[in-house]
Swiss-Prot record:
Membrane topology (UniProt): Multi-pass membrane protein
A single cellular component GO annotation: plasma membrane
Key words, A-Z: Cell inner membrane, Cell membrane, Ion channel, Ion transport, Membrane, Transmembrane, Transmembrane helix, Transport
Name of protein: Large-conductance mechanosensitive channel
Length: 138
């Protein structure tokens, strides 16, 4: 049973999947930083210093706080600014994946379109000898 598991775990697809998950997690952190630390502050600067991640709507009259963390302690809130930030994060990840997959497909297509290399003179001679030997055996 251990041998079967080792064979399964060492198959190319499983290892590729594990590497992809690890790289994806690291890439997710980079995109989160890009959105949270660069894009959203730029959008905030353009819109007059607004911080979208701190926008919320309280669902009860008990919510009187002015920042999201304190508002969550007071009661239920719709954290729509955080949702907006995460949606932008998702769109960036989806776009980057689209570009990467498109690039990979283009590379595969270029490899498939390349003609087979011409055989060298030795290979042609060996092929002729093989064909002659086949006809002689008949």
């Amino acid at each position: 049973m251990l041998k079967e598991f080792r064979e399964f775990a060492m198959k190319g697809n499983v290892v590729d999947l594990a590497v992809g998950i690890i790289i994806g997690a690291a890439f997710g952190a980079i995109v989160s930083s890009l959105v949270g630390d660069i894009i959203m502050p730029l959008i905030g600067a353009i819109t007059g210093g607004l911080d979208f991640s701190n926008y919320f709507t309280g669902l009860s009259s008990a919510v009187t706080a002015t920042n999201l963390a304190d508002a969550k302690k007071q009661g239920a809130v719709l954290a729509w600014g955080n949702f907006l930030t995460l949606t932008l994060n998702f769109l960036i990840v989806a776009f980057v994946l689209f570009v990467v997959i498109r690039f990979m497909n283009r590379l595969k297509r270029n490899d498939a379109e390349k003609p087979a290399p011409k055989p060298n003179p030795e290979q042609e001679l060996l092929t002729e000898i093989r064909d002659i030997l086949k006809t002689m055996r008949r």
